[in-house]
C-alpha cells in the first residue's frame, strides 16, 4: 500500500527566477531559514549560500546551475496545514538560460524576483518568455526595497509596460531605502512588521500608517476589482454590496486568475533585511498551483505516432516522469533529476525510457538539497527527485511504466552561438579530455563538442564567453585537465535565398560492377526558428512511378545531411533549406545506396551554390546602462560595431538605458571597452536574439579566410 506523508494537494513545485543580482539566491536562503531547513542564514557575498554550492558559484557570487531542495511551510501564523515546497533556484545570467528552460518545463509555479532599484531587466524578460512558453503561473517578489533608489510602484508599472503583464499588488511597501520597515497587507488592510531581534521569524500586525491610508485604499480597490472579474457571480455580489466579499472570496478568486495566467500578484520586501520573504511564502501556498491543479498530463504513445495518451496526477495511475536534468556527481556518478507526473516508483524498480525505447532500472533514489543527498525508498505523483544508476537517459526523456508507455512533451534547447578550440596541455590529459567533454555535454544540452575535420582540433560551443569559461574551469577542477583555449569564434550559419532545381549524377565504370546514382532535387529557402535548428532542414520525397526505388531515398537524404553539417559556402552548418527529390533514374545492376548518397550530395552542393547562398550571423540583444555624460560615446562605439539602436529610456539607477541589436562578432572584449569609455560606471548585458544576413563585403572576407585555412 502506498503511504504518502504529504497529501498531493499540499505540494508546491516552484522555481525562483530572476535577472542576475536581483537577490534571487538570497531570497532562497531566507526561505530555507524560515522553513527550518537551515538554522543559520547563508549569504552570497560570503560564499556561504546553500544553493550556490559549486566553487565557481561561491567565488563569482552568481548561480550557474539550477539547484533543487525541499522545505515545509505552514504559514507565518501557522495558519495552514504543512505544505511541501520543492524549490529549484535557477541562474540569472543569460549564458545559463538552458537551466531556466529545463526547470520551467517541470515546475507548476514560479516566483519571479525583481530588484526594487533595477526593475525589469533583460534576463527578467527572457525568463518571463520561458514561463509564458510553458504557461507557468507565477507571482512576483520585488526585492531590495531597502536599497538606495528602490521604488516599488515603479517596478509594478514596468511589469505592465515591459512584460505586458497584468500586475495586481497584494502588498505595498512601508517606507523605502533605509526607512523600509515592512509591508501593507492589502487583503487584511493591516501593516505587517517583522521583528529584527529574531531575524524576522516572528511578526506583528499594526494599523496602516496615516500617510499610506489613501494609497492603500486605492490599491485595495484595484485588487478587489481584479478579483471579482473572475466570475459574474462574484461581480454581482460585489456590485450589490461590496462589504459582502469575504477574505476567502477574494483569495479564491485571485488564485483562480493566477492559475489561468490572467494576473500577476505582486509582493515586496528585502530578503537581506529579513522582511517580506515570509509573506511571499504564504502567497506561494495560497496562490500558486499544486500538482492536482494540472489534473492530467498529455503525451503520445509512440515517437512517430500522434495517438494521444493521458495520465491523471494520481498515485494510482501508471508511473510517468520527465527527466529534466542529468548531472555528474563525484561520489555516485550520474544523477538523473526527474519530475513524477503520475504513479509511484520505488528504488530497484524497472522502468521504460520511451524516447530511447530502452528498459532501465532505478538504483537508488535521492532527495537533493543543493549538493547534499538524502536517500528515499519511493517517490509519488508530484515529486521531484534524482535517480542514481540510470545508464542511458538524456534531458527531456520520458521515464514510464514498462507496461503503459507514454512520451511526454520534451523541451527545446538553443543552438550555441560561440565556439572555441580547446587543446589539452599533455598527451595524458588529451585522452581524458574526450571523456570529460562527453560528460559535460551530456549534462548541458546547450553545450556542443566536435572535432574539426580539417584541423583535427577539438571545438567546444556554447551560449557565451562566460558559459565556455565556466566549462573549461570545470574540466580543470572536476577532471584535473589543464587545457589551452583558443580565441572565441562566432557560430555562423549558411542558407539560400532562391529556389533552384538541380541535377546530380554519380557514374563510375571500372570493369565489373560500376556505380550509378541520378537525382533531381528542388532546393527552397524556408523560415527558421532562431532558437533551435531542429526545424531548419526538411526533406520531401515526391518520386512517383518507381523511377528511383524507395530503398535508395534515405541514402539521398543522408548525403544531403552530411553536406548540411559540413557547409558548402564556408564550412559552416546550413539552416533553412527545404529539399524535395522529384525525379532521377537508376541502373538495375550498378545502382547502390552509396551511389545515390553521393549523387544527392553532389546535387545539393551544386544547387546550393546556384541558389543565392548567404552567410548568417548571430545578432545579440544588448542593453547598456550608462551615466548621461557618456551616452554619446557609447552610442558612437555601438555604431562602429554595426549596432542598431532600438530604444533609449531613463534608468532607475543612473542616467540612461540604451537598447541595441549588435552582431556577436563585434562584441568580443566589449566589457573592457565599455569600462574604459565610462570609467567603469556603465554596465551591460546581452543575449542571443536572431540570425541575420552578413553584409556582402564582410561575408566575402570570412569566406576567403576559411578557404585559406
Swiss-Prot record:
PROSITE patterns in the record: G_TR_1, G_TR_2
Top-level division of the source organism's lineage: Bacteria
GO molecular function: GTP binding; GTPase activity; guanosine tetraphosphate binding; translation elongation factor activity
Biological process terms in GO annotation: ribosome disassembly
Pfam families assigned: EFG_C, EFG_III, EFG_IV, GTP_EFTU, GTP_EFTU_D2
Location within or outside the cell: Cytoplasm
Record domain tr-type G: where: 9-292
GO CC terms in record: cytoplasm
PANTHER family: RIBOSOME-RELEASING FACTOR 2, MITOCHONDRIAL (PTHR43261:SF1), TRANSLATION ELONGATION FACTOR G-RELATED (PTHR43261)
Classification via NCBIfam families: EF-G (TIGR00484), PRK12740.1-5 (NF009381), small_GTP (TIGR00231)
UniProt family annotation: Belongs to the TRAFAC class translation factor GTPase superfamily. Classic translation factor GTPase family. EF-G/EF-2 subfamily.
Protein name as catalogued: Elongation factor G
Organism of origin: Blochmanniella floridana
Amino acid at each position: 500500500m502506498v503511504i504518502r506523508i504529504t497529501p498531493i494537494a499540499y505540494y508546491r513545485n516552484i522555481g525562483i527566477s530572476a535577472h542576475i543580482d536581483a537577490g534571487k539566491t538570497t531570497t532562497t536562503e531566507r526561505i530555507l531559514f524560515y522553513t527550518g531547513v537551515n538554522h543559520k542564514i547563508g549569504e552570497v557575498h560570503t560564499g556561504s549560500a546553500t544553493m550556490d554550492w559549486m566553487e565557481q558559484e561561491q567565488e563569482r557570487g552568481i548561480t550557474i546551475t539550477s539547484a533543487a531542495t525541499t522545505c515545509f511551510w505552514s504559514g507565518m501564523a501557522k495558519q495552514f496545514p504543512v505544505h511541501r515546497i520543492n524549490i529549484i533556484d535557477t541562474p540569472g545570467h543569460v549564458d545559463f538560460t538552458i537551466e531556466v528552460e529545463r526547470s520551467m518545463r517541470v515546475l507548476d509555479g514560479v516566483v519571479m524576483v525583481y530588484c526594487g532599484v533595477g526593475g525589469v531587466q533583460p534576463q527578467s524578460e527572457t525568463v518571463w518568455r520561458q514561463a509564458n512558453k510553458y504557461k507557468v503561473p507565477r507571482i512576483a517578489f520585488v526585492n531590495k526595497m531597502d536599497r538606495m533608489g528602490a521604488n516599488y510602484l515603479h517596478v509594478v508599472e514596468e511589469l505592465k509596460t515591459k512584460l505586458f503583464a497584468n500586475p495586481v499588488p497584494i502588498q505595498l511597501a512601508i517606507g523605502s531605502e533605509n526607512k523600509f520597515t515592512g509591508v501593507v497587507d492589502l487583503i487584511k488592510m493591516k501593516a505587517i512588521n517583522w521583528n529584527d531581534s529574531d531575524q524576522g521569524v516572528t511578526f506583528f500586525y499594526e494599523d496602516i500608517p496615516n500617510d499610506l491610508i489613501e494609497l492603500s485604499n486605492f490599491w485595495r480597490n484595484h485588487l478587489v476589482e481584479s478579483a471579482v472579474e473572475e466570475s459574474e457571480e462574484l461581480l454581482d455580489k460585489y456590485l450589490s454590496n461590496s462589504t459582502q466579499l469575504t477574505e476567502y472570496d477574494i483569495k479564491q478568486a485571485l488564485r483562480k486568475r493566477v492559475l489561468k495566467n490572467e494576473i500577476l500578484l505582486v509582493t515586496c520586501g528585502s530578503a537581506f533585511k529579513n522582511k517580506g520573504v515570509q509573506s511571499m511564502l504564504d502567497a506561494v501556498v495560497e496562490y500558486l498551483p499544486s500538482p492536482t491543479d494540472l489534473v492530467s498530463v498529455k503525451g503520445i504513445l509512440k515517437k512517430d505516432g500522434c495517438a494521444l495518451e493521458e495520465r491523471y496526477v494520481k498515485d494510482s495511475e501508471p508511473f510517468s516522469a520527465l527527466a529534466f536534468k542529468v548531472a555528474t556527481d563525484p561520489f555516485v556518478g550520474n544523477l538523473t533529476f526527474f519530475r513524477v507526473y503520475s504513479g509511484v516508483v520505488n528504488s530497484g524498480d524497472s522502468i521504460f525510457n520511451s524516447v530511447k525505447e530502452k528498459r532501465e532500472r532505478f538504483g537508488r533514489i535521492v532527495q537533493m538539497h543543493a549538493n547534499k543527498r538524502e536517500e528515499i525508498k519511493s517517490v509519488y505523483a508530484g515529486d521531484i527527485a534524482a535517480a542514481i544508476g540510470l545508464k542511458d537517459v538524456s534531458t527531456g526523456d520520458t521515464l514510464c511504466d514498462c507496461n503503459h508507455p507514454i512520451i511526454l512533451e520534451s523541451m527545446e534547447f538553443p543552438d550555441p552561438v560561440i565556439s572555441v578550440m580547446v587543446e589539452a596541455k599533455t598527451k595524458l590529459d588529451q585522452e581524458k579530455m574526450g571523456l570529460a567533454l562527453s560528460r559535460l555535454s551530456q549534462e548541458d544540452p546547450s553545450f556542443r563538442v566536435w572535432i574539426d575535420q580539417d584541423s583535427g582540433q577539438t571545438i567546444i560551443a556554447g551560449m557565451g564567453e562566460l558559459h565556455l569559461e565556466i566549462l573549461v574551469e570545470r574540466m580543470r577542477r572536476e577532471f584535473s585537465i589543464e587545457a589551452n583555449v583558443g580565441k572565441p569564434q562566432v557560430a555562423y550559419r549558411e542558407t539560400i535565398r532562391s529556389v533552384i532545381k538541380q541535377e546530380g549524377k554519380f557514374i563510375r565504370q571500372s570493369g565489373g560492377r560500376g556505380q550509378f546514382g541520378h537525382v533531381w532535387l528542388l532546393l527552397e529557402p524556408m523560415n527558421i526558428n532562431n532558437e533551435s535548428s531542429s526545424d531548419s532542414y526538411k526533406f520531401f520525397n515526391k518520386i512517383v512511378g518507381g523511377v528511383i526505388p524507395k530503398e535508395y531515398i534515405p541514402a539521398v537524404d543522408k548525403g544531403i545531411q552530411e553536406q548540411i553539417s559540413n557547409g558548402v559556402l564556408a564550412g559552416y552548418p546550413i539552416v533553412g533549406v527545404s529539399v524535395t527529390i522529384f525525379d532521377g533514374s537508376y541502373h538495375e545492376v550498378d545502382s547502390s545506396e552509396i551511389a545515390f548518397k553521393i549523387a544527392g550530395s553532389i546535387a545539393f552542393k551544386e544547387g546550393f551554390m546556384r541558389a543565392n547562398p548567404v552567410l548568417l550571423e548571430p545578432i545579440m540583444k544588448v542593453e547598456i546602462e550608462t551615466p548621461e555624460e557618456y551616452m554619446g560615446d557609447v552610442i558612437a562605439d555601438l555604431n562602429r560595431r554595426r549596432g542598431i539602436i532600438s530604444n533609449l529610456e531613463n534608468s532607475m539607477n543612473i542616467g540612461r538605458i540604451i537598447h541595441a541589436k549588435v552582431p556577436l562578432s563585434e562584441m568580443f572584449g566589449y566589457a573592457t571597452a565599455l569600462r574604459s569609455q565610462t570609467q567603469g560606471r556603465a554596465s551591460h548585458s546581452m543575449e542571443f536574439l536572431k540570425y541575420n544576413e552578413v553584409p556582402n563585403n564582410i561575408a566575402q572576407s570570412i569566406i576567403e579566410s576559411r578557404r585559406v585555412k
